[in-house]
């Protein structure tokens, strides 16, 4: 059964509601049958070589936190079959979209987790990831909720621990305040370097970027996206 209350959470409450529209029968079946085969088992200590997590042989491992409907993650894992991907999404309807996509086009280089991403970060070995993507995270607009934003000193410490030197942390948002917040936090953190040289480095989408449903909605409503890339020193 799907636990919509989802009692397991890590140190921070970084996401809001977990469930939207009721799932269709096929989607519920995918949660019962497909997700257990792809979900990381955090009760088992992580291997020092994360490549062993995947059915396909991979050279490096990347992580996407809060993949929404999975448009980018499914696209990227197909585009780079030599890389392993860990995707985390606590929102049940987003995970349902990803499972439906994987049911049609499987990715042997992809593993999933449907709870708090900080639990995965704390489970991973040191210097084990080649990249972390955080695209359009919940901005938590109200000041009293800013502490829930995923970009924080504590989570940047987590990123710094699990990222290899030279690895990328990529962040995209259409919320100017959150963009500035992320720039301030990353630029004052000793482990990260922002190497932008011109406005194109943050105004232009990432190479090969497929776009997302959320981004398309933001563009229709007149908002623009900013794409930041930080390098692990």
Curated annotation (Swiss-Prot):
Pathway: tRNA modification; N(7)-methylguanine-tRNA biosynthesis. GO terms for cellular component: tRNA methyltransferase complex. The keyword Oxidoreductase does not apply. S-adenosyl-L-methionine binds at residues 64, 89, 116, 138. The active site is at residue 138. It catalyses: guanosine(46) in tRNA + S-adenosyl-L-methionine = N(7)-methylguanosine(46) in tRNA + S-adenosyl-L-homocysteine. PROSITE patterns: SAM_MT_TRMB (PS51625). Substrate binds at residues 142, 174, 212-215. Its EC number is 2.1.1.33. It is an enzyme of class 2 (transferase). Keywords: Methyltransferase, S-adenosyl-L-methionine, Transferase, tRNA processing. It comes from the Bacteria. PANTHER family: 3-DEOXY-D-MANNO-OCTULOSONIC-ACID TRANSFERASE/TRNA GUANINE-N 7 - -METHYLTRANSFERASE, PENTACOTRIPEPTIDE-REPEAT REGION OF PRORP DOMAIN-CONTAINING PROTEIN. Belongs to the class I-like SAM-binding methyltransferase superfamily. TrmB family. This is tRNA (guanine-N(7)-)-methyltransferase. The gene is trmB.
């Amino acid at each position: 059964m799907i636990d919509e209350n989802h009692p397991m959470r890590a140190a921070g409450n970084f996401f809001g509601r977990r469930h939207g529209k009721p799932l269709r029968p096929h989607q519920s079946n995918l949660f019962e049958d497909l997700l257990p085969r792809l979900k990381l088992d955090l009760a088992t200590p992580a291997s020092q070589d994360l490549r062993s997590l995947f059915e396909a042989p991979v050279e490096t491992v990347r992580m996407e936190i809060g993949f929404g409907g999975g448009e980018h993650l499914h696209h990227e894992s197909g585009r780079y079959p030599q890389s392993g991907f860990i995707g985390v999404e606590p929102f049940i309807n987003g995970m349902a979209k990803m499972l439906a996509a994987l049911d049609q086009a499987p990715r042997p280089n992809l593993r999933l987790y449907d709870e708090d991403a900080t639990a995965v970060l704390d489970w991973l070995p040191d210097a084990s990831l080649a990249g972390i993507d955080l695209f359009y995270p919940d901005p938590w607009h109200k000041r009293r909720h800013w502490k829930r934003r995923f970009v924080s000193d504590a989570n940047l410490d987590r990123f710094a621990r699990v990222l290899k030197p030279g690895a990328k942390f990529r962040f995209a948002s259409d919320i100017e305040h959150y963009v500035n917040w992320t720039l301030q936090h990353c630029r004052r953190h000793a482990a990260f370097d922002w190497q932008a040289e011109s406005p194109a480095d943050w105004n232009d989408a990432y190479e090969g970027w497929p776009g997302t449903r959320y981004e398309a909605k933001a563009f229709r409503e007149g908002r623009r996206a900013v794409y930041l890339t930080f390098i692990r020193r």
